[in-house]
Amino acid sequence: MSLTDYRQAFEIVKRNILAGNSYLANLTCKVPVSTNLTLEDVFRYSKALYRLWLKDKLVCFSPEIFVRIEDGEIKSFPMKGTIDATLPNAEKLLMDDSKETAEHATIVDLIRNDLSMVAEQVRVVRYRYCDRLETNKGPIFQTSSEICGVLPDDYPSHIGDIIFRLLPAGSITGAPKSKTMDIIEEAENYERGFYTGINGLL
């Protein structure tokens, strides 16, 4: 993507935010990558907590859980806010940053609302705690929250419906989700496909 094309996409998002149509949008673009590594090499090289390799098809990795369902509860752990952990006072800088705080509050509210579509008694169990993650370029601090809700008794026979109702993930779209998805579609002008999707284990 050229800088001109990126600026055009960015301006679409900016215009909509200034108009009040969205207050958080995750703008992405395709980036060509040339490497002599195989998909398996990339998979094995990644230090991400969650990763998937489908032979000759794709590789993906993420530090973030979309949802965890067990014992009648659904949990989500949205992440927003990152800083280089080697910086002096990095954790304090991250926790005191007003932009990062605002973005995190927005995504927590969005995920809480999303979980309320499929669960009762939705609550924020832990708000804005800091995790240290190891990456190939060094350690980072990332802020997360834990949100939990109680699923109906018959949830095991409706797992697919629950997951599809929550998609796409709020952390890779924005808020309000529906309108922001329209803005993203106009700005990005490409299909994300598997990118920013989810995978899981039953």
Can you say where each PLM-predicted feature lies in the sequence?
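Extended alpha-helical targeting/anchoring segments
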Residues: M1-L202
